[in-house]
Amino acid sequence: MADFDAVLKCWGPVEADFNTVGGMVLARLFKDHPDTQKLFPKFAGIAAGDLAGNAAVAAHGGTVLKKLGELLKAKGNHAAIIKPLANSHATKHKIPINNFKLITEALVHVMQEKAGLDAAGQTALRNVMGIVIADLEANYKELGFTG
């Protein structure tokens, strides 16, 4: 619970502009791990240098961070949020679980830069995302998706 609260303390700048911060997170993910861009068919043709300012990337990043905000505010009581998220990411989008770990690191980096997330906050964010990812993975297994 303390980890969720620690992350929520720095969540204000993210909530203030989900799309801008979300675009930064996805651009960072694609820069650090270029293969992840292939998992997003609508972004496949966007040149690396154009990702950061792309409106579609920003909009999708905003969607990702809004959902993460819901998960944070649920403070671990998130089964009703996780189940449909896992279902769509396993059955429709086919996103391997490791990619959630990769986006976690992109998010940590961006939140450090843009929201002043200190070392303790970074640890808290990694802990929270570890819980979320473990629950996603459990749902993936129930669905028979090993991606």
UniProtKB/Swiss-Prot annotation:
Binding site for O2: H60
GO function term, MF aspect, one: peroxidase activity
The protein's enzyme class: oxidoreductase
Subcellular location: Cytoplasm, Sarcoplasm
Keyword Phosphoprotein appears in the UniProt entry: no
The enzyme's E.C. designation: 1.7.-.-, 1.11.1.-
Domain Globin: 2-141
Tree of life domain: Eukaryota
Main subcellular location: cytoplasm
GO cellular component: extracellular exosome; sarcoplasm
Keywords, sorted A to Z: Cytoplasm, Heme, Iron, Metal-binding, Muscle protein, Oxidoreductase, Oxygen transport, Transport
InterPro entries for this protein: Globin (IPR000971), Globin-like_sf (IPR009050), Myoglobin (IPR002335)
Catalysed conversion reaction: Fe(III)-heme b-[protein] + nitric oxide + H2O = Fe(II)-heme b-[protein] + nitrite + 2 H(+); H2O2 + AH2 = A + 2 H2O
GO biological process: removal of superoxide radicals
Binding site for nitrite: H60
Protein residues bound to heme b: H89
Pfam families: Globin (PF00042)
Subunit: Monomeric.
Function: Monomeric heme protein which primary function is to store oxygen and facilitate its diffusion within muscle tissues. Reversibly binds oxygen through a pentacoordinated heme iron and enables its timely and efficient release as needed during periods of heightened demand. Depending on the oxidative conditions of tissues and cells, and in addition to its ability to bind oxygen, it also has a nitrite reductase activity whereby it regulates the production of bioactive nitric oxide.
Family from the record: Belongs to the globin family.
Name of protein: Myoglobin
Gene that specifies this protein: mb
